[in-house]
From Swiss-Prot:
Pathway: Protein modification; lipoprotein biosynthesis (diacylglyceryl transfer). It comes from Streptococcus agalactiae serotype V (strain ATCC BAA-611 / 2603 V/R). NCBIfam families: lgt. It comes from the Bacteria. This is Phosphatidylglycerol--prolipoprotein diacylglyceryl transferase. A 1,2-diacyl-sn-glycero-3-phospho-(1'-sn-glycerol) binds at R131. Pfam families: LGT (PF01790). The chain crosses the membrane at residues 12-32, 49-69, 83-103, 109-129, 167-187, 197-217, 226-246. GO terms for cellular component: plasma membrane.
Length: 257
């Protein structure tokens, strides 16, 4: 089993979970800043947004998780703030981040569609990296299986949980997001391929489809009224993404990326 603590500095410790999250965020910021000039967005605007949105999105992701696990946290309120032990929901962070992005864009007189377009690839690769934090924390896994001979030993050993091997759903989602990142980075600058806003739409459809399938394999899903919340949200993302693509394709006045 991999030690979830990467570095100890006296009474303080730095966990692999935090390293994965922060590494993904830094890469996302780099990619957004590199693309920002194409959309006439200042690098300072990117940094200002990240400094505001990153901590608030983490809080939003935690609140989302706690709400759907209230039966546990109502009895252990002290653990609500123990975010270093894991327990954040990506959808909570995405919803919070999207709301903040729209508000920030209007305040800075930035087209929010452009901002979403430059942010989407970075978010996708950040999610791919962040899932490895779940791996080290032994969370976001699937049902028990007899063996995991198709994965490297270090993954197989870490996925031995509660006396059984578990489907490495974290790995599936990480690879799915990485593949989506490669695709969108390969086509977004091709002439007359994507219209303004369609990079973000691609993210909605791609991530929504993958998450819907992978969520069905997990055993730690958040439920509401007996239904997997993330699957419902995935369906909503896919519908929004497809509707927006159809609309943007029909409107001649919308420019290409």
């Amino acid at each position: 089993m991999i030690n979830p603590v990467a570095i100890r500095l006296g009474p303080f410790s730095i966990r692999w979970y935090a390293i994965c999250i922060v590494s993904g965020m830094l890469l996302a910021v780099y990619l957004a800043m590199k693309e920002a000039p194409r959309k006439n967005i200042k690098s300072d605007d990117i940094l200002d947004f990240i400094l505001m949105a990153f901590p608030l999105s983490i809080v939003g992701a935690r609140i989302y998780y706690v709400i759907f696990e209230w039966a546990y946290y109502s009895k252990h309120p002290v653990e609500i703030i123990a975010i270093w032990n894991g327990g954040i929901a990506i959808y909570g962070g995405l919803i919070t981040g999207a709301i903040l992005l729209v508000i920030f864009s209007y305040r800075r007189l930035i087209n929010p569609i452009d901002f979403l377009d430059i942010a989407a690839p970075g978010v996708m690769i950040a999610q791919a990296i962040g899932r490895w934090g779940n791996f080290i924390n032994q969370e976001a896994y699937g049902r028990a299986v007899k063996n995991l001979n198709y994965v490297p030993n270090f993954i197989k050993n870490q996925m031995y949980i509660d006396g059984a091997y578990r489907v490495p759903t974290f790995l599936y989602e990480s690879l799915w997001n990485f593949l989506g990142f490669v695709i969108i980075m390969s086509i977004r600058h091709r002439p007359r391929t994507l219209k303004q806003g369609e990079v973000a739409c691609f993210y909605l459809v791609w991530y929504g489809c993958g998450r819907f399938i992978i969520e069905g394999m997990r055993t730690d899903s958040l439920y509401l009224a007996g239904l997997r919340v993330s699957q419902w949200l995935s369906v909503i993302l896919v519908i929004i993404g497809i509707v927006m693509i159809i609309y943007r394709r029909r409107e001649q006045h919308i420019s290409y990326y």
